């Protein structure tokens, strides 16, 4: 357990090294904290990107009119990933639809059963073909298993007599 914790800690420290200066932000001090360049550090700012928030450490004199990806180069990959996730979620919602409305509406279940019957009568296409073939293979395997079981039952009846 301790070894797992140690390995995890080392992996996280290697993957996410601490910033150059690791010190607390001096909020109540009268002396402003200065960088070697003479610029004053601002407290962390939450930058909103979609539904996710990113912490930004930087100078208060920066131009806030820039886009989040331009003003925070260290978070550009995170912002791209967040946008990709949002796009994926929207695409999935568009294809699947609102699942919650299907659960609440029992009338649609009857329509779904009618739709399934209609689909079983029609020749399957593309992805449906794969599932159709899989279903038929499973049915054939089940029928073969039942035939073997019936044959073994007949043999047992012949051996032991009725």
Swiss-Prot record:
Its main location: secreted. Residues 25-119 form a propeptide. Keywords: Amidation, Cleavage on pair of basic residues, Hormone, Secreted, Signal. One of its GO terms (cellular component) is extracellular region. The modification Phenylalanine amide is found at residue 160. It comes from the Eukaryota. Residues 1-24 form the signal peptide. GO terms for molecular function: hormone activity. Pfam families: CRF. InterPro entries: Corticotropin-releasing_fac_CS, CRF, Urocortin_CRF. It is found in: Secreted. Belongs to the sauvagine/corticotropin-releasing factor/urotensin I family. This hormone from hypothalamus regulates the release of corticotropin from pituitary gland. This is Corticoliberin.
């Amino acid at each position: 357990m301790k070894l797992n914790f140690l390995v995890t800690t080392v992996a996280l420290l290697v993957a996410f090294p601490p910033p150059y200066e690791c010190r607390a932000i001096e909020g109540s001090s009268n002396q402003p904290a200065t960088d070697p360049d003479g610029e004053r550090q601002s407290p962390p700012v939450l930058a909103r990107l979609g539904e996710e928030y990113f912490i930004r450490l930087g100078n208060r004199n920066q131009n806030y009119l820039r886009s989040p990806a331009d003003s925070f180069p260290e978070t550009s990959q995170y912002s791209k990933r967040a946008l990709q996730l949002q796009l994926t979620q929207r695409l999935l919602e568009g294809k699947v639809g609102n699942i919650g409305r299907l659960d609440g509406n029992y009338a649609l279940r009857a329509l779904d059963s009618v739709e399934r019957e209609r689909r079983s009568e029609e020749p399957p296409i593309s992805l449906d073909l794969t599932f159709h073939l899989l279903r038929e293979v499973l049915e054939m395997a089940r029928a073969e298993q039942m035939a073997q079981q019936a044959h073994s039952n007949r043999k047992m009846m012949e051996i032991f007599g009725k």
